[in-house]
A protein has these predicted regions:
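Conserved catalytic-loop position in the HRD/HxD motif
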Residues: 7
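Phosphate- and other anionic-substrate recognition elements at nucleic-acid/protein interfaces
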Residues: 2-3, 13-138
């Protein structure tokens, strides 16, 4: 199975894809959307069709106390819209601290601030997807 990982931010969507075996996640690209969700859904649908994706894993931001805040509500709403747009399963994956982990990894790798801004969302999507794949494989 081939998966698409998504990290939905307020202005960008980080994406990652798995290999055909569903074992390894790789950063794909970052899509700027500026809250134009209809266009964003269309772009995701195109990716799903072009790359022959079997399922989507969407990052689900929960608060540290396990409650669902405004960003979590946005992800739930986006998941509903995705399910209406693509005819494949959409799974939620807890994404707490993934962007921080991605940023920390880039800083440790001496990646410049300018470059970090371009890749942090797709790296966060990769972490989200790899976490899901690892959990699924157990």
């Amino acid at each position: 199975m081939k998966y698409l990982g998504l990290d939905l931010g307020s202005r960008t969507l980080g994406t990652a894809i798995s290999d055909n075996t569903g074992l390894i996640a790789t950063s794909y690209k970052t899509i700027r959307h500026n809250e134009e969700y209809e266009r964003l859904l269309s772009e995701v649908k195109t990716i799903v069709e072009e790359l022959k994706i079997d399922a989507i894993v969407l990052g689900f931001p929960k608060n540290m106390n396990n409650t669902i805040g405004p960003k979590g509500e946005l992800s739930l709403s986006f998941k509903e819209q995705l399910e209406k747009t693509v005819d494949i399963p959409v799974y939620l994956q807890d994404e707490r601290l993934t962007t921080k982990s991605a940023t920390d990894a880039l800083i440790m790798g001496n990646v410049s601030r300018k470059k970090r801004k371009k890749v942090v969302d797709s790296l966060a999507a990769t972490i989200i997807l790899q976490t899901y794949l690892d959990k699924k494989g157990r």
